[in-house]
Amino acid sequence: MNTNDTAPPALSGMPNGADTLFLIFLALILVAVVWLGGINFREGQHLEDAKRNGEAWAAWLTEAGTKRMEEDFEPKACAGAGGDEKSGSTWGACVEHLLKESELKGLVNTFHNQALQVIEKCDRGDLSTAGGIRFDNLVPTPPGSAVPMVVNPLKADDSIKGKLQIRVVICDKGGYPIKVAELEF
């Protein structure tokens, strides 16, 4: 057997080429994680702002729902019939008034940096609905029914002269609905 009495070469302690490539790759991955984390944080903030918009609407509707059947309720566009059965208040007139002349007029859809829009449905195929707000009319079914309520979107020509059960929904970035509140109006 041939033995070589030479000692192995001493290592310098410096990274070789493969080590350097690995460290560069690791640094790039770290930068990508921080960058994507920042993007996801901003998107989460947009969603939280949209939820706050929905909560502002829910708070206004809840407060107004306790007083709107009184004769001197303002705004008249959102007043209930009270004693007047001929009152023609509609949901569309109420929403239009609130978007133009109430404290809710300044709400902004942060996904698009535009004025908040009331939409009929959250649509996954139409991403312009992201951050929009939707209102559903919850109609209770008779006791003992398998389904406790029927959910219909509130349309502009729906009458609001009586009490309504309303669900406030906002749309997330992907067009999925997020329930914010259910209230009596």
PLM regions with names:
Residues G37, A59-T62, A93, N137:
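Intrinsic disorder/low-complexity segments enriched in polar/charged and small flexible residues
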Residues L11-W60:
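Amphipathic alpha-helical segments typified by the pilin-like N-terminal helix
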Residues M1-T3, R52, L99, L104:
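Generic cytosolic/nucleocytoplasmic N-terminal low-complexity/intrinsically disordered segments
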Residues M69-F185:
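Extracellular/periplasmic head regions of type IV pilus-like filament subunits
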Residues A50, G54-W57, A64-K67, E71, ...:
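Catalytic toxin/effector domains delivered as secreted proteins or via bacterial secretion systems
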Residues M1-S12:
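N-terminal Lys/Arg-rich, disordered targeting/topogenic segments
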